[in-house]
Amino acid sequence: MKVQIYQLPIIFGDSSKNETQITQWFEKNMNAEVDVVVLPEMWNNGYDLEHLNEKADNNLGQSFSFIKHLAEKYKVDIVAGSVSNIRNYQIFNTAFSVNKSGQLINEYDKVHLVPMLREHEFLTAGENVAEPFQLSDGTYVTQLICYDLRFPELLRYPARSGAKIAFYVAQWPMSRLQHWHSLLKARAIENNMFVIGTNSTGFDGNTEYAGHSIVINPNGDLVGELNESADILTVDLNLNEVEQQRENIPVFKSIKLDLYK
């Protein structure tokens, strides 16, 4: 499976310019060999939290329409990061994915809101776990958002249910880059799966985003990584490595869920 990761500099509070930027990246970088494209967290408006009442998408309407067009045009599955999204008068940080036929194949609201950013004052936390879902080739994957990375429990269910890839979409700060590396590697090792961390780059006020989008294999080895600059990372994944690692180190056969209460 060939995966292409878009490490974008999100334009603060301007969904139109962000859509234009993404469109240009597709036009410049897409080719028929790519199976999956991945976008970062909150790519429509960034963390313009105080103005999301006016700027957030309405029930994924605009964001889904935009991504659906790209998926159908380029015949590619898109793990579409996440967007600020109003539903039932509440604002969510909503991750979603669209297959190459233009079908919505996943929707997930960020469960863990970041207290350090006062997200709870502006956003509503999701109430459902991240589910496994199928890409066009039948591969089961899952999609989580940024701060979710610090909660290993959230990935256990989709991993145990057969997901072979975990996509963490993020706006992760440079000040915690060491945590980004360590936590992504840990999630890959403990679940015997590929983990893909897709981050943004650039500045949002005084916050510098770390970039360093990264792919880690089920053994915890580095497959590919970007630096802090805006760029694209393309990797080829051998998904047989997941089954091999789960046979060699059968953690899900050894797990004792009844004891972990």
From Swiss-Prot:
GO MF terms, alphabetically ordered: omega-amidase activity
Domain CN hydrolase: 1-239
Database matches in PANTHER family: DEAMINATED GLUTATHIONE AMIDASE, NITRILASE-RELATED
Alphabetized Pfam families for the sequence: CN_hydrolase (PF00795)
InterPro entries (UniProt xref): C-N_Hydrolase, C-N_Hydrolase_sf, UPF0012_CS
Keywords tagged on the record: Hydrolase
Catalytic activity: a monoamide of a dicarboxylate + H2O = a dicarboxylate + NH4(+)
Family classification: Belongs to the carbon-nitrogen hydrolase superfamily. NIT1/NIT2 family.
Enzyme category, top tier: hydrolase
Superkingdom field: Bacteria
Active site: E41 (proton acceptor), K110, C146 (nucleophile)
Coiled-coil parts of chain: none
Keyword Nucleotidyltransferase among UniProt keywords: no
Name of the protein this chain belongs to: Omega-amidase YafV
Enzyme Commission no: 3.5.1.3
Signal sequence, renumbered to the chain: none
Record function comment: Hydrolyzes alpha-ketoglutaramate (a-KGM) to alpha-ketoglutarate (alpha-KG) and ammonia (specific activity 3.87 umol/min/mg), has weak activity on L-glutamine, almost no activity on deaminated glutathione (dGSH) and none on glutathione. May function as a metabolite repair enzyme.
